[in-house]
A protein has these predicted regions:
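Non-catalytic interaction surface on structured domains
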Residues: 20-22, 31-33, 76-77
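Alpha-helix termini
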Residues: 26-32, 85
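Structural micro-motif
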Residues: 51-61
Length: 88
């Protein structure tokens, strides 16, 4: 299992949707329940996000590699989870 980092802004509507979809996926697919997502709010932790390269939130990194940036869909969130579970 690979680590997931999600960069967000607290009041971002797209971030709220992504968080809701993450919870829905975890309820629908038991294999996703083991996944831990480290959420970093760029406003609260500007010193941490300086090490990441992105323009839009939410942005997902899996094992240190950016896998999605910007407006997500439920399918994109599923893809992020699948990448975190993959052996490659």
């Amino acid at each position: 299992m690979k680590p997931i980092v999600m960069i967000i802004l607290e009041n971002c509507p797209h971030c709220k949707n992504a968080r809701r979809w993450m919870e829905e996926h975890k309820e629908e697919k038991p294999q996703y329940q083991v996944l831990q997502v480290e959420m970093i709010d760029e406003k609260l932790h500007p010193e941490v996000i300086q090490t990441y390269s992105y323009y839009y939130v939410p942005t997902y990194y899996v094992a240190g590699v950016k896998v999605h940036e910007g407006v997500p869909t439920k399918e994109i969130v599923c893809s992020v989870f699948e990448q975190a579970l993959s052996k490659n």
